[in-house]
Every structure is written in C-alpha cells, then in structure tokens.
C-alpha cells in the first residue's frame, strides 16, 4: 500500500511504503536505490496524520506553529521573539494586537506573511478568530483582497471554513472587498461555500451581491451546479430559493404590514349568502382537514408573520436598531456597499447641504469694507476709486460664524446667564397678588366664561328687571286718587 503525503498538485508528494515482512532488500531484487523508500514502524508518525487535504487545502503539513518565515529552531534560547501583527493574530492575542494597531504599524509589518503567503487576517479567518478580525479591521494598510500562495483571500477562507460571523463582518466592514476574486483553481468564495455546504455563508454572499452565474474555467460549473455535484442538497435548495425570491421586500421603506387577501376571497362574489349557504360553508370548513401546507405557501399566514416580525416597521426591530439605507434593501445580484462607504456617501451629502445653507446664511454678513492703512493713504483718482470694489467677500465664509468669532475671552457659543437669589427666611409668607379685576382687556389670565352661561345670566337679569317694573306699575295702580292729585 502506497500513502501520499506532502505538497503537490494532487495532494501528495513523498511516497511512503507500509511495513513489510522481513525479506531481502528491494535493492538486491530490483536494483533500485534504497534511498527512494522509507519504512515506518508506526503509522502515527506518518506526515499524513497532520494533513489538511480534507479541507480542500494544499498547505504543507506541520507548519501551524511556525508563523513566520524564520523557524523556531533558528532563534537562540533566551532571546525573546519580536511581537508582530502576524504572531499576535496567529496566537489570537487580541490585547497585544490592539496595542500594536494603536502604535501605528507600517505597511511592511501589516503585510507580513508566513511561508504559505498568508497574512494575519487570512490566518484569523482560517481559524475563526472573530475578535482578531474585528481588531484588524481598524488597522491601516490591511489588504482584504490579499491572496496567499494558493490564491485564497480572507473571504474565500472564511466562506470555505463556514465562519458565517467572520464572513458577514468582512462583507459589512471591509471597504473595497472583491467578491469575485478567484484562487489558482478558478473558484470564487461562493463556489467554495457551495462545495462545502456552508448554507449560511452561501446566503450571506448571495445577498451581498456575489455572482450566481459565475463558472470555473476547468469544468464550467456554476455555484449551484457545484453544490449539486458535491451532494450538498441543502445548499442547492437555498440557492434556488434565493433566486426565486431575490429581494426581501420587508427590509424596504415601502413595505406595508397589511395581510393580502387570499385568492379565494378575491374571486368570491360580493353577493350575500343565505342561511343555508352559510351553514353549508361552515360544515365544509369544519370537515376539511387543515393541513400545514396551506399556511406554508408563499404569501400565506406564516409567510406574512415572518415578514411582519422582521420588517423595519416591526416593533421588535424599530426599537432595537435603525437601518442605514432603508430605501435600498439588499438583493441577490446587487453589490452591497460596506458600512463605511454608506456613511461616507451620506455624510458627504449632508455636509454639502449644510455648507450650502451656511453659505446662503453667511453671505450677507460676510461682506466687509476694506479700509486703507494710514501709511498707504494717498490721493487717488476718481476713476481708480470707482474701479475698486467696495465689498470684499471673506475667504473663510464657509466656516460657521460661531467658529470665526471664537476667542479666549468670549467664545462664539452664547453663554447662558444664571441668576442666584438669596433664600427667604423660614417665617416668610408670600403676599397674595391683588385681584386685577374682571376686565376683558387685562393682560392676565382669567377664568373662561362660556357663552351659554353669559346668555343665561343676561336672560335672568332681564326677567328680574321686568318683574321689578311690573311690581312698580301695580303699586301705582293701587295708590288712592287723592295721593295722585297731591
């Protein structure tokens, strides 16, 4: 039996023979050089035990501990190794890595690679070090599209390994990420994720705008065909489902939370049913088996529930987070920008709008008159004085006035006034304000009077006056005539 191990285009290099029974040397029988073969007493000592060919990788075995180009044996004992970004990333030392990033490393230090051509970002994506990837996102000079000796990028490595958190972080927080970068075999990140059956990574890459119709140069298969070729049925189903419904409409600002009417309700006649028809419909709905297939169809009740709970206007989502671009939801085949690119574009638009408003507001105030100095005063001709423009626009008119008027004595921002009054004595009792009267033109607030109450009051006064007049008339009639004569 022959075992293949080590580097090579076919996944094997050195030929190793299994232990044989005590027989004469093969060199005496065949005349071959005995140095061409190596005999092993134990299979655990074979180099193939450390092979990672099962992960579809062709890195030479036995090099995970050696992170740099300099081997550990070449470093003398007692001499501490220099702390580099590559060593910190390979050891998942986030504290040291952040300290090195704050120090401001050079481009050579950031692009340091191991013997396989992998940078610290690719190694972190390979092992699934999420905190290391987050720390490297803040490091300058990081090339997210760097390819190792096999042409694999950080995105290809993370998607192939199935690290969906790192894949989403690379897609969202690394500007300039190339989704269609291929390795030496012509495979993209979506193809590698489909081959390995990483359904979550396939979904993330497709919603980020990866090309679903891309084909490799050797076999000419698409990602869906590669998933079917390698027996990844779940990946095939996910790709087919996303191609049928490419855009999640609940993530847009035009989505409505209303449940659409079913086809039966739309086709149902508007005429009213009699008692017998309603009773028949009730019996039919009762005896009919309510299977889950009707609710799991597209546009059904469960589909609407999922859309409603995950939409931007859902109470569970609107309170927790706020999307950056609600007018541009993700879609299959449409390239999605990183968060930094979206915020930069929106910040530029807001800055331009604010600058235009500030310019319009500050133009009338930014015109000043230029007065000549005392040393340069000289008689000028009327033509020269007429040709010189009087108003001169300030060069710094684009700056806000509060920044231009800032000084060490009086800043541009208006300082509020604070008045402090002495506390009164404990026995102090405030005087009640005198009543200002019920005049209508008073500046103080008054109790409102309703119109119906005023009319009722006027009617009562009129009735009292009428009764009083009638009483006086009756009194005059009852008086004797001799009193009237006098």
From Swiss-Prot:
Highest taxon above the source species: Eukaryota
SUPFAM superfamilies assigned to the protein according to its UniProt record, in alphabetical order: Ankyrin repeat (SSF48403)
One term of GO molecular function: DNA binding
Phosphoserine: residues bearing it: 397
Spans of repeat ANK: 80-109, 116-146, 150-179, 185-214, 219-251
Region feature (Disordered): 1-75, 354-394, 426-486
Positions with biased composition (Acidic residues): 30-42
Biased composition (Low complexity): 372-394
Alphabetical keyword list: ANK repeat, Coiled coil, DNA-binding, Phosphoprotein, Repeat
Coiled coil regions, renumbered to chain: 451-479
Cross-referenced PROSITE patterns: ANK_REP_REGION, ANK_REPEAT
Keyword Coiled coil found: yes
Compositionally biased intervals (Basic and acidic residues): 451-479
Name by which UniProt lists this protein: Ankyrin repeat domain-containing protein 33B
Species of provenance: Mus musculus
Gene name of the encoded protein: Ankrd33b
């Amino acid at each position: 039996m022959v075992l293949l191990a080590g580097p090579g285009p076919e996944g094997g290099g050195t030929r190793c023979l299994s232990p044989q029974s005590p027989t004469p040397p093969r060199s005496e029988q065949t005349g071959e050089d005995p140095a061409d073969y190596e005999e092993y007493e134990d299979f655990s000592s074979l180099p193939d035990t450390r092979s990672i060919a099962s992960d579809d990788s062709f890195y030479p075995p036995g090099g995970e501990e050696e992170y740099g180009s300099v081997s550990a044996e070449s470093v003398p004992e007692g001499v501490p190794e220099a702390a580099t970004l590559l060593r910190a990333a390979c050891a998942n030392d986030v504290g040291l890595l952040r300290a090195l990033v704050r120090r401001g490393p050079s481009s050579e230090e950031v692009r340091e690679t191991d013997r396989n051509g992998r940078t610290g970002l690719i190694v972190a994506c390979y092992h699934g070090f999420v905190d290391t990837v987050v720390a490297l996102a803040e490091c300058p000079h990081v090339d997210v599209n760097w390819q190792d000796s096999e042409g694999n990028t950080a995105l290809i490595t993370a998607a192939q390994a199935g690290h969906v958190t790192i894949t989403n972080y690379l897609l969202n927080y690394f500007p300039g990420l190339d989704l269609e970068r291929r390795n030496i075999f012509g495979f993209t990140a979506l193809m590698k994720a489909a081959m390995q059956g990483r359904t979550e990574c396939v979904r993330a890459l497709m919603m980020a705008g990866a090309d679903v119709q891309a084909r490799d140069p050797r076999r000419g298969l698409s990602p869906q065909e590669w998933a079917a070729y390698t027996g990844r049925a779940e990946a095939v189903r996910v790709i087919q489902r996303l191609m049928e419904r490419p855009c999640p409409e609940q993530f847009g600002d035009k989505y409505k939370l209303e449940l659409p009417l079913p086809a039966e309700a739309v086709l149902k006649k508007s005429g009213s049913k009699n008692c017998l028809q309603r009773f028949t419909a009730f019996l039919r709905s009762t005896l009919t088996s309510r299977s889950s297939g009707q609710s799991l169809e597209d546009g059904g009740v469960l589909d609407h529930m999922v859309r409603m709970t995950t939409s931007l206007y859902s109470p569970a989502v609107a309170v927790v987070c706020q999307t950056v671009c609600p007018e541009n939801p993700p879609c299959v085949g449409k390239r999605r920008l990183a968060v930094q690119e979206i915020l930069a574009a929106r910040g530029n638009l807001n800055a331009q709008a604010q600058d235009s408003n500030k310019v319009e507001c500050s133009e009338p105030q930014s015109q000043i008159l230029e007065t000549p100095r005392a040393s340069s005063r000289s008689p000028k001709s009327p033509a020269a004085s007429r040709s010189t423009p009087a108003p001169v626009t300030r060069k710094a008119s684009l700056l806000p006035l509060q920044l231009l008027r800032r000084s060490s004595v009086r800043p541009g921002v208006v300082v509020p006034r604070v008045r402090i009054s002495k506390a009164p004595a404990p026995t102090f009792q405030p005087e009640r304000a005198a009543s200002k009267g019920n005049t209508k033109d008073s500046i103080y607030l008054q109790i409102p009077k309703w119109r119906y109450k005023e009319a009722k009051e006027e009617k009562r006064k009129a009735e009292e006056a009428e009764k009083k007049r009638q009483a006086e008339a009756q009194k005059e009639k009852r008086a004797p005539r001799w009193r009237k004569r006098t």
